[in-house]
From Swiss-Prot:
Protein name in UniProt: DNA replication and repair protein RecF
Name of the gene encoding the protein in the UniProt record: recF
GO molecular function: ATP binding; single-stranded DNA binding
UniProt similarity note: Belongs to the RecF family.
Localization annotation: Cytoplasm
Length: 364
């Protein structure tokens, strides 16, 4: 899977861009604030219809503009397709080969991407929202039904919270029953992904670290009896919701569910957040991204496009080398941003292209 052409119109500070990326390594360099991350954001949006910065539609449109357009030509198995996302303040529209997609499931999967940003390096030591965000992105790529399951859960959660905010008990049981059923679908899909990724994680971590440390990744239910959940998931969630009923009325929001769950990262049987060194934590996240890439490659029988946003400043020389060696072995396309070419050993990257970005313009 390769992005052969990219065209942008009025996307943030990238006004009129036409780009023909190389099939392997593409390095974009320039000072901060010139548009490097915006370029990666446009590719991510072309694949997922979302901004990885969690930006509103209006923020994606250039100042004074009415809309933004992101269009790309994607090649897979020698077949090319043109995909496009039109961004307006009131919403987005997706097209494949000029045909408007009424079902987004028909749009997703034409371009698969894996994102690696400085934010994700802090995933181990950061808050649970960072880990949930990573997990949701990762699950969705190979399980398109997950998006529907999560949106259904989010709608039910919103309605239940609306009742809790006004301390309305009438009707809460109906929404609680729906919440539990929707939550189980989300949790099931999240756990299934972690089971698959966990088998790959150890091998990549050992390759990076060069030692026999053991790593674990587990799903942690917030406020739910894990043993009871293993026996009777629905009853475990219902029991937890009953136990937190007073807290929910006081806070005006739902205290139990996938929106509160977390991931546990373990190293040698202890929590990586508390006991792993900074270097070990970075190795863990790097191994996690490698496992994600491998999982997507197996899922689609084609590697995803990798987006590396200023990672050379976050990884030390050894980990950078390990990552690049991993990428060299795979027929995957990579987009790298950096403030200086000195941060990337370009001469060691085969089939590389470099682009300078200045004030929203790309200079070859």
């Amino acid at each position: 899977m390769k992005l052969i052409k990219l065209k942008l119109a009025s996307f943030r500070n990238l006004q009129n861009i036409e780009l023909a990326p190389g099939k392997k390594f593409n390095v974009f360099y320039g000072n901060n604030g010139q548009g490097k991350t915006n370029l990666l954001e446009s590719i991510y949006l072309l694949a997922t219809m979302k901004s990885f910065k969690q930006a509103r539609n209006a923020e994606l449109i250039a100042f004074g503009g009415e809309f933004a357009l992101v269009k790309g030509t994607v090649e897979r198995d020698q077949v090319r397709r043109e995909i496009a996302v039109l961004i307006e303040k009131q919403g987005k529209k997706a097209k494949v080969d000029a045909k408007l997609m009424t079902r987004l499931d028909d749009f997703f999967g034409n371009l698969n991407v894996v994102l690696f940003t400085p934010e994700e390096i802090s995933m181990v030591r950061g808050g649970p929202d960072l880990r949930r965000r990573y997990l949701d992105r990762a699950v969705f790529t190979c399980d398109l039904g997950y998006l529907t399951a999560y949106h259904d859960y989010a709608k039910i959660l919103k309605n239940r919270n609306a009742l809790l905010k006004v301390n309305e008990t009438a009707g809460i049981e109906v929404w609680t029953e729906q919440l539990v059923q929707a939550a189980l679908l989300v949790i099931e899909r999240r756990k299934a992904y972690l089971d698959r990724i966990g088998r790959l994680l150890q091998g990549f971590y050992s390759e990076i670290s060069g030692n026999d440390e053991t790593v674990q990744i587990e799903y942690r239910l917030h406020g739910v009896d894990a043993r009871l959940f293993a026996e009777d998931p629905a009853e475990a969630l219902n029991q937890a919701l009953r136990a937190h009923a007073a807290e929910e009325r006081r806070r005006g929001s739902t205290a139990i569910g996938p929106h509160r769950d977390d991931l546990y990262f373990g190293l040698n049987g202890r929590g990586a957040r508390q006991f792993a060194s900074q270097g070990q934590q970075r190795s863990f996240v790097l191994a996690l991204k490698m496992a994600e890439i491998e999982h997507i490659t197996r899922c689609f029988e084609a590697p995803p496009v990798l987006l590396l946003d200023d990672m050379t400043s976050e990884l030390d020389r050894e980990r950078n080398r390990n990552l690049m060696e991993f990428l060299k072995k795979r027929e995957m396309q990579v987009f790298i941003t950096t403030t200086s070419l000195h941060n990337v050993d370009v001469d060691e990257l085969q089939d590389n292209r470099t682009f300078r970005i200045k004030e929203g313009k790309i200079l070859d």
